[in-house]
């Protein structure tokens, strides 16, 4: 998994590239907790995410809860339908 970040107006766009699985879920959670120091409004761009397992999905829910607790907002964009 790679993570790229881009500031767009008052939002921070975070792009997940590759696979979000149990192997990297903690890395994703840590990255997003650190990102809270840079903003409160996030767009999670999943256009380049190839796969997410249940642990990765749980990490996204964890991140959503932390952002909400901090008074922020998280939107998910470009979710790809895969057969």
PLM features: residue spans?
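Short beta-strand/loop segment at the start of cytosolic alpha/beta domains
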Residues: 1-15
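Amphipathic alpha-helical interaction surfaces in cytosolic regulatory modules
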Residues: 20-83
